[in-house]
């Protein structure tokens, strides 16, 4: 005779520290600024959370300016924040955990780009890294409608989201000391457009004639987070 056995009750899976989403990182920048770095993917849903957090934090009494970056937010203060940052950290964590997002109804710009040649001196390096042809890279680069995630690096420079990972190329080991304004470049999984002359460690594949920053205009930067860019082909030089 077989003795019946008592069914075992399934146990709930145990959540360990490694199963949890990493916490945002909060650090001081000098004596009057703080940087909030969000974990997770660098994509539009994530960036919309950054925009929402910036809008909220901008209204906090101690915050002078809230500046969204790529997966991060910088808060500046008119005077050094109190030594005990626990309340501010808690407010940031709580606001982030609420998961609010913000959609920005920006404008759409078409940027004619001269690819390759003197305008895109590193296009050959992108070809060598990806194994794609020049025509393939240009076609892939011009296909998306890119969203301006943030402004930074230098006045008017726009960080764009939405580049196809097939043309991702590591940043250059030796930066270029002088890169003309309007240069269209690839750095890792990102692409962007230089607003003015200056150094860069990205791979320049082309150039546009559009002016992105004019200190005499109001606002001086042409683009803003939430705007969209579509690159078009002016010509391809090889």
Predicted regions and their residues:
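Glycine-rich active-site loops that engage anionic ligands at enzyme catalytic sites
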Residues: 2-4, 15-238
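Low-complexity, simple-sequence tandem-repeat tracts enriched in small residues
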Residues: 7-13
